[in-house]
Amino acid sequence: MVRGEIENNWLCFVVSYFYRYYWNKNYVIMKETCNLFFRGIHMITGEIKNKVDKIWENVWAAGLTNPLSVIEQITYLMFIRALDDQEINNIRSKTLLGEDVELIFPESDIGQAMRWSNFKFRNADEIYNIVSNFVFPAIKAMKHGKLPDFDEHGKLIPIPDTDETKDGFDFFAKHMATATFIVPTAQVLEKIITGLDDLYTHDIANLDMQGDLYEYMLSKLSTAGTNGQFRTPKHIREMMVRLLKPTPKDIICDPACGTAGFLVSAAEYVRANHSKKMDKNDWKHYESNMFSGFDTDTTMLRISAMNLMLHSIKYPQVDYKDSLSKQNDVYEAYTVCLANPPFKGSLNAATVHGDLRSITNNTKKTELLFLALFLRILKKGGTCACIVPDGVLFGSSKAHVALRKEIIENHHLRAIISMPSGVFKPYAGVSTAILIFTKTQAGGTDNVWFYDMKADGFSLDDKRQPIEANDIADIIDRFEHIDSESDRKRTEQSFLVPKQEIVDNGYDLSINKYKEIEYIPVEYPPTSEILANIKALNEQIMADTAELERLLNE
């Protein structure tokens, strides 16, 4: 038996079997215990990263140089392999447990040829033909957890619509309608499949490691999107999640989800801190309804769905939706909102929901409209941590002031964390801050906590190399003990500002408005001494000039 994925998955399967049939309890908990155990003894090593880089280089060498396109194509292949892995488990369940399990792949010759474990042994041209002409069209037409078959002429036979409950894989497949297969050559496809198969067979021990692997690939996205969105660094996401401390009972949303990084970080936090106490209903909620995301980029939706699936979210609730539009009718649905919404981009004001326009004085600025959206979609008592450009904090337009006033007067503004401008490099050098507030609809803002983050553990240039200086642990510790912050002076890195002072300053939330700087007095020499030094310097210049003229005249 190959060590790694097969061994670990088989062990989890066997343990789960005995747990289900001899103790008759929630086998999901035992499966989770297995996953957490294996997560503790495996990690993404430099060798694994080198293998990923090699796959990446092979694709780039063939002319596919857009990082997003590369990840998208690899995502499709990971999904294809995941289907075959699940099929192997289904067959085991039928054979060993006698369960009536629906199989994913058709039993025809073409259907079985579409399985990763079968086509990977063929030559490059045959693999390319099977994947491009059969597997890819099949996953785009997947329904009810099953792939369609093909007739003797190679024509796809659609699966009829029924009321059958959706399978977890359907939540990814539903975003495949506009997908295109653009791996350029048979040779490149063979190299990708061989490389991925090597990773899964020898290096990727479990689902958590697949998630870590995917995170590493996503870290290669080094450019901002056309709508002003860019990927939030993982350590910043994790800090924001730790500040909010989500629980298994929460319903979490990112209405501008991108690659679903915030949802993944929240999921990992819940598992790490609450898994031992979660019951069957908690796990069901965790796998299906706890995490929701919206985006208008279908490529991002496919990537985010895969990202969530690889982090144990069986039914990823990510949907195509313009969060700011009139078509988005979500109200008071979530208890936690985590987001880094786009700061710019095209916006058709006529399509913006009236509720958002009324709060923001008919603004077209997406960063303000998203803040209004967060207030609308949160349940009463729900909390938001979001990233905004500094302009939101001090902008003097009617829209800026109105929105800040709404949050401060009608809800509970808890914290402003000012981040250095290099946090989002190499995407952008924009200065940003984290806003933390709770929806109350009855006020509650008393003292607002400000923190001036100076370092996040990485250099603030384009290279973003690890450094020792890091304020994140201090931010979390001070926020958790915010009652002890009242004695801090305005010259310190964090301090509290009374609501009335903010109101008196036109609802300005920029930290520099309230931060005090200690100026160390500089002692200068007497004026007579300064003049004497200038005179001596002037005499020296004159002497040197005369000597230079003498040398030139010789």
Describe the residue ranges of each PLM region.
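Non-catalytic, mostly N-terminal accessory regions of nucleic-acid modification and defense proteins
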Residues: 5, 10-243, 247-248, 317-326, ...
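Short acidic (Asp/Glu) and glycine-rich catalytic loops that position anionic groups and cofactors
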Residues: 53, 314-318, 350-354, 382-388, ...
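Short, contiguous acidic/charged loop-to-helix segments that flank catalytic cores in large enzymes
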Residues: 65, 348-365, 391-399, 420-427, ...
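Conserved Class I SAM-dependent methyltransferase catalytic core
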Residues: 70, 74, 296, 301, ...
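Hydrophobic alpha-helical scaffolding
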Residues: 203, 256, 293-297, 336, ...
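Conserved S-adenosyl-L-methionine
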Residues: 226-339, 344-346, 355-356, 368-369, ...
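Aromatic/glycine/proline-enriched transmembrane-helix motif characteristic
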Residues: 345-347, 380-381
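C-terminal, active-site-flanking charged/polar segments
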Residues: 412-413, 425-475
